[in-house]
Amino acid sequence: MTIRDLHVHFQGHEIAVLSANEHIDEPAIVFIPGVLAPINFWLACLPESILKNRRWYAISLPGHQPSKVPLGYQAKDIDEDWLNHLYQSVISQLEGKRRVIVVGHSTGGFSALNLAVNNSDSLLGVISIAGFFKGDWGGIEGQLVKLAGLGKWAKPLFQASLAISRKIPVLQAYISSLLAYDRHTYNDSPMTKKMLEEIQDNMQAQNLSALFPLFNRISNFDIYPKLNAIKVPVTIMAGSHDPVIDASQSLILAAAIRHAQLVVFDNAGHMPFMERTQQFNNELCAAIDQFMQSINK
């Protein structure tokens, strides 16, 4: 596995990218993480068969270390169209007119679906893992979204909450476990420890102020009216007991998107990578293989 660290520019933002296995001659897979997760999250959460044998990129959410934001970056800058243009631009700068597969987790899943709404001609397929069409969240991350949604006066409290959690490793691990439903399996998974180690440097270096605009706007996201515009193959993956994105959102997505395939991880939450590792790896690889095979049809 060969990896390069890149930064791609978009409207004053420097969007961090990992570019892997550029020598492999096949369509690239683009991975977009969820909020609070730097791009190296994927190094711990993907199967070796993908990490080593596929050509892939991991593209950051805006404002997430090591990405950089411009002076004057504000919540009012962000909506569904802006996110679409951001990822459309970054992918185009990386891949030109070549079609790609996009895989996203949580807000990354939303971003992948949002790309599919607007850019069918540039995509081979989309996989949404615990993604959503509407920014109606529960759990610990839902509380952060609600807090940020109160406006500028809540920003110091938002930042303080994140600062406290990242300073205390035991607290950070506990809070991450609240994303899972099967916490016993999540906590026992070696992948969990690896993930927390992989993201640690970026988490500690994170400019917490840069996270606020996206969190402030998430509750306003809603692409449901546009889902019928999706014309590419889509796989929806969801935990049956996701505490952040209610599983009903995934059922609605699967019903609203033509020919969408639905994969449900029974008795799992927001982190199927750890909660249902073997099933997740099998389903992810199968979906990617299916999209790759469509090139020759």
Q: Model regions: which residues?
A:
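Conserved HGGG/HGGXW glycine-rich cap/lid loop of the alpha/beta-hydrolase fold
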Residues: 13-69
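Active-site loop/oxyanion-hole signature of alpha/beta-hydrolase fold enzymes
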Residues: 57-103, 282
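Conserved hydrolase catalytic core segment
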Residues: 98-141
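Flexible "cap/lid" loop of the alpha/beta hydrolase fold
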Residues: 126-165
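Conserved alpha/beta-hydrolase catalytic His-Asp/Glu region
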Residues: 137-139, 162-228
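Short beta-strand/loop motif that positions the catalytic acidic residue
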Residues: 230, 236-238
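Acidic catalytic loop of the alpha/beta-hydrolase fold
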Residues: 241-245
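Catalytic active-site module of serine/aspartate enzymes centered on a nucleophile-bearing elbow/loop
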Residues: 260-297
